[in-house]
Amino acid sequence: MSEEWISDRMHLIDASGIRKVFDLAANMKNPINLSIGQPHFDTPEVIKDALCQAVRDGKNAYSQTQGIAPLIEKIQSRVDAEYHHDDRQVFISSGTSGALMLVLNALINPGDEVIVFDPFFVMYSHLAKVVGGKLVFVETYPDFSIDVEKVRDAITDRTKLILFNSPSNPTGYVASEAETRALAELAAEKNIALVSDEIYRAFCYDQPFVSPAAFNENVIVIDGLSKSHSMTGHRLGFVHGPQSVIQQMIKLQQYTFVCAPHPVQWAGLAALDCDISDRVEEYRQKRNLMRDRLADKYEISGAQGAFYMFLKTPWGTGTDFCTEAIKNNLLIIPGNVFSNRDTHIRISYAQENPILEQGAEILNRLADHKM
């Protein structure tokens, strides 16, 4: 009987394909796990100490919906120094996922079109559907670059928003300054909201990070500390954009998440002064290790940032390949979790080097084992 209570919108989305892979692998014993979407290192001690101190100091009640003033002020000063936009306002969100939910609810009406680049972060398509948006995919295969003319061709009079993610999950692709500028200028020309998911901005290995907000003062930026400071469980993000949009997101946060976790915001304040350059360099070296080990057997595009590689399977579908990998005690994610194609696999190199070496050995062995 309770099945009848489920809303229609919930039938538009499916459980995450990543969760399905984890369920499939539940009986694996000590798998070589290259599926992880979070850093392998622990939260820095200075952040833990700040969190514990905030709890001891009684920072355990609600904060202001928009976030604590010291954290907002510190981020706002950095944003102002980078962009020099008079109307760019910051607020603190309950994670970047919470921010995505807020911005889509604040901007999308039923039937509005949302442009998403394929491959895409798994959450984008589902959240857009939940708010009644119509997905319009722009393919970036084979090298995952942004062809702005394809975006222009995809725009209609119903286009409301473009979701952009660089460095990208799942491809690791980092958009060039030229691509980023062209996309930002197109959004401005067409009066379309451009949402830039910058959660991996710290992890750029071959070129500097460039935000579309540098070229379009109305870009809405979603960022956070989950990946850069290994705080995925803390649920702390931040957003900056035009005040008119930010105020609507704050209003919606008041009636949904209420606020970001209060003591975690004080930990975030400490995190902003925490040097993570050694971790970024470590991940650059891990990227290089995996690229060197796999280059003879796999086509490697992207992988200039984040901590992922999106590899074309040497045989079969991504699903077939991952099924065989699990039989060989290797846990990876099929590409159709992130794409309308099933031709690739996603691996994460957020792991200790001996595990990466074992994973690369299995991947190379599987490449020669055509089904």
Where are these regions (language model features)?
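N-terminal small-domain helix-loop-helix segment of the aminotransferase-like
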Residues: 2, 7-95, 102, 274, ...
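Helix C-cap/helix->beta junction micro-motif
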Residues: 28, 131, 189-190, 328, ...
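Flexible low-complexity scaffold tracts in large eukaryotic assembly proteins
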Residues: 34, 166-169
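PLP-dependent enzyme catalytic core of the Aspartate aminotransferase-like
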Residues: 77, 323, 327-332, 338-371
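PLP-dependent aminotransferase-like
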Residues: 106-164, 185
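Active-site pre-lysine segment of PLP-dependent enzymes
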Residues: 129, 136, 145-158, 170-194, ...
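Conserved core segment of the aminotransferase class I/II
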Residues: 217-284, 367
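Conserved glycine-rich beta-strand-loop-beta hairpin in the small C-terminal domain of fold type I
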Residues: 265, 269, 283-291, 300-312, ...
